[in-house]
Amino acid sequence: EFDNIVGSGSVTISAGQSVKTIEVAAKSDTANDPIDAITYTITGVTGDSTGAQLGEGLVKTVQINDNDAPDISWAVSAVTLEEDSGTVSVTATIDGSITKLSSSTININVNPSSDDTAVYGVDYEILELNQVSTFAGSGQTGSNDGIGSEAKFRRPDGSVLDASGNLYVADSDNNLIRKIDSSGNVTTWAGNGDWAHDRMEGPKLEVGFARPSFMAFDSAGNMYVAENGRQRISKIDTSGNVTHVSGNGDHGDAIGDKNSTQFRDIGGIVFDSNGNLFVVERNNHKIKKLVFDPSSGAATSSEFAGSGSYEYANGNGSDASFRHPWGIAIDSNDNLYVSDHNNHRIRKITPSADVSDFAGNGNWGQKDGSLLNARFRNPGPLTFDSNGDLWVADQGANTIIKIDISEGYVSKFAGKVGNNAHKDGSLDEAKFSRSMGLSINDSSIFIVDNESHRVRKIDLSPSITIPATQTSASITLKGIDDY
């Protein structure tokens, strides 16, 4: 078992030798672990050697796969639940307590009986799904790694999910990128935490980021990071190396190559299907587009939408105007959706840069309704789910909003309208605190609360999570009358 081990040592290559082998032996344990990894680097080479490296590269990683998945048993093999008639508890038990500080999550399926020929709508609800919980963070500022509430953040901003379901959070005031796996284990994934550090390129844990704020993955799995402390975009490639992509570090408004481009207060960033990166500029009130050279990979920026004036107008490209645009998301047809923060609207931008109103009537407030009759209160981050529906963190109201695209309807999904606060509980009673990050997959919504220094979670699919040191857990199904 190898868990969070950091160490160093020396290797001596004697005269006449050119290779020294380090052996790693995996030790068996009884815990159900995630995949462990040990990464080796070489530093401080001395003597007559002209250079030393690990194999063919400068970094090598050893992966240890776990073989201790627990056996799961159920209290009963099947249960029957009548519509609109009481509740039933489903309990899962594993064959031994989880000794490692992690949890096990078991996804379950709930189906109508085989002889049910008249199924309409949904005949049950999972009571535990209608809850907002704290996924990670103690609420106190700090940079501690750990499980759930053991971890600490300092004014975290944006978030993004990778293809494996890991959540990445821009821990802005810690100048770090944090990774949270499905069990809530928080680790420092990139950054040395030192804004003043003069190394802005290199291995990801040696680079000093400056207020990382928002992130996006390209189709190859490389992460792009908006650094608002330096007004630039950096890239973390799949080998863990950080390079400068765009932005010369000055607050301004200029386009061109990476050393000519200037940004002013970067908001959300997103890739289209052609590999172009769109960058929201909150205080330039516009969206820039980065196009990458297919040979060199160098990025060139251009104006895409927005006049730069703090106004409201629809139109094409620079004929349109925004007031402090904030978040950005993209649909399957490469249409962009931008939260126009101080116009209290969601704007739609086609691939040809035609800007129009998509949702919100422009009046400040929180009101459900059809797309252009609904009201927002300073909308912030937004993201699409796999069904093509758009979700919005309405920052001024401290609520999470769902926009049903097919129905053309806007409705509050979670959060009690009010000032910044922290409260877990039912969807209607939960409270949020300036949500800066919003990410969603098929099973969960993740909300990054900037002022409470926490990551919140809403479960969307039936699952049972057995906490560390426990052997069982339950969920409750309630029958409902759907017609």
Residue spans for each PLM region:
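Conserved beta-propeller blade signature
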Residues: N166-Y168, N222-Y224, N276-F278, N335-Y337, ...
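Short loop/turn segments immediately following the C-termini of beta-strands
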Residues: S172, N228, R282, H341, ...
